[in-house]
Amino acid sequence: MGIFCPFLRFSLYLCTMKLHIFNPEHDLALAANLKQFTAPHAGRQLRSDLAFIPALWAEEGDLVLVDDIDFAKNRVRHFGAELNSKVEFITKPQQKHLLKTEFLDSVHPWGWNLSLKGELERLGIPEIMLPTDAVLNKVREVSSRQWAALHLQRGVEYVTETARVKELILQHGKAVVKAPWSSSGRGVKYVSAEDFRTAGDYPTFERWVANMIYHQGGVTVEPLYNKVRDFAMEFEMKDGKALYRGLSLFDTIKNAYSGNVLCSEDDKVEMMKPLISEAQLAGIRQRIIGVMEPALKDIYSGPFGVDMMICTKGEKDEFCEAVLNQEGEDVNRTGLGVVPCIEINLRRTMGHVAIDLYEHLVANSSDEMKTNRTNIMRVEYDGNRYHLRIKPGRPSEEAPLH
């Protein structure tokens, strides 16, 4: 039997209503690891402007937390009027009132961190619906680049001394130095051995490394590869199993996310075939599942992704796996290699959004899907607000997602 709430326009049923939250500041909150964390202005605005996007994957009758209901309804209608009737947008004051009826089933954020838990506690979300601090500490550990270096990467070293960082850079020639937790290119430095050879010391960089080691315990150092294409594999932990959801073909500008290809999985595999075989992709996928499933089964349920890279493979690129031909032979005719783990995103990703948006558009026979088999999903900033937009077209060699 449905229970009426004055803030909702339809009846809600026991054990079916979920609360969805878009908290894109998650990676920064992981780094801070505080119960009360204030994201930079850009992060807060992104959260407010795109708070509606969980409507793309939420189920019938679910709640989506937003700052402004009318604004969210106006934004989501561009992706189909049916989304406004499928979910209920709700503000924090309304959420507090709703909890008095105690019919909320579960909470599904973009990513779990200590700051979000504190925010939800202040909203009155029952403790039983929130992860324990011990579980959050484990999620934070698996989210770190240190964990990825130990379990899924080759040629990446976690370093706790500045002198060793310099030694590795001189060894690699060109290297990427990363903080264990960071977001959208922050906490990532590209360094050349030449920077040290010409100046002897590199005080600005060394201060940055020392600061990262002091605040986060260390940094990772890896060789700098000559990138050909970014891509990712998206997964979901459900009932203790890691399930594959699909490929993500995305682009970055200055190391910050800029867009995703919107098309079927078959089409994405076809786009990748000139670079890597379907069989090799399947092998990488199974290796990731083999590592992540046992690591996550007792601590995490929800989406996650693994970023990867196709690169040119030189003789010195010993840690970059050779791309195999269709028969699985390492003939290295293409001169390409694959890095099967750049980093782990233990949260929902824009790749998941692209998969869900494409499925929604196909299911509702949108004009975009009828006119263009392949589209581009972009997050754009117009100087005032962030927008999630669909643009016709497909990537090219000259402009992968432009």
Question: What function would you assign to each model-found segment?
Answer:
Residues 326-329, 363-402:
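Peripheral (often C-terminal) accessory segments that flank ATP-dependent C-N-forming ligase machineries
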Residues 296-306, 368-375:
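Flexible, glycine/charged-enriched surface loops at secondary-structure junctions
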Residues 175-205, 232, 254-272:
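Glycine-rich phosphate-binding loop of ATP-grasp-fold ATP-dependent ligases
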Residues 18-56:
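N-terminal-proximal low-complexity accessory segments that begin disordered
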Residues 173, 202-256, 305, 309-324, ...:
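Phosphate-binding site of ATP-dependent enzymes
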Residues 3, 9-16:
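Short, positively charged and aromatic/hydrophobic N-terminal segments
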Residues 235-292, 325-326, 330, 345-368:
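ATP-dependent carboxylate/phosphate-activation module, predominantly the ATP-grasp catalytic core
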Residues 44-56, 65-167:
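Conserved N-proximal alpha/beta basic substrate-recognition cap immediately N-terminal to
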